[in-house]
Amino acid sequence: MAPKGGSKQQSEEDLLLQDFSRNLSAKSSALFFGNAFIVSAIPIWLYWRIWHMDLIQSAVLYSVMTLVSTYLVAFAYKNVKFVLKHKVAQKREDAVSKEVTRKLSEADNRKMSRKEKDERILWKKNEVADYEATTFSIFYNNTLFLVLVIVASFFILKNFNPTVNYILSISASSGLIALLSTGSK
């Protein structure tokens, strides 16, 4: 049986590995899929009110395309977040280190080892990078998706039947942001 100190060290290592992995927590997944569903459903209003596609007659089409688009947009969120997280962590490292060191100096830090201080700084840096990368990923992908839908709908596919216009503009927009998100920028 492993000693308790080794078990604690293993759990700390697992937490660090989890922070740098591509896997999302349940909270992040819910946030991404919730936002992706909302932004994917917005074009329904556009096609219902402007292109006069009936809600009831097109309900199945709206549902299928919204679900497909939700998956692709959430996929783009995840990829962009992962790429940005490390860049943000590098840029914010000095500021986060100063803030954590200042807070620790205000508190009683004489009892704290250098390793524990470094772990707190790393944890805070990772938390800040995760938050900033998540919010920027959602903002960037939502903006790009909605701009692509509007451009495709009103300019590129304006002479198509509204049903074909909807299918092509939603699938092309969500597919394009999912494709663009796979690049390493």
From Swiss-Prot:
Residues 49-54, 158-163 are cytoplasmic. The modification N-acetylmethionine is found at M1. The chain crosses the membrane at residues 28-48, 55-76, 136-157, 164-184. One of its GO terms (cellular component) is Sec61 translocon complex. It is a multi-pass membrane protein. GO terms for biological process: SRP-dependent cotranslational protein targeting to membrane. Heterotetramer of TRAP-alpha, TRAP-beta, TRAP-delta and TRAP-gamma. TRAP proteins are part of a complex whose function is to bind calcium to the ER membrane and thereby regulate the retention of ER resident proteins. This is Translocon-associated protein subunit gamma. It comes from Rattus norvegicus (Rat).
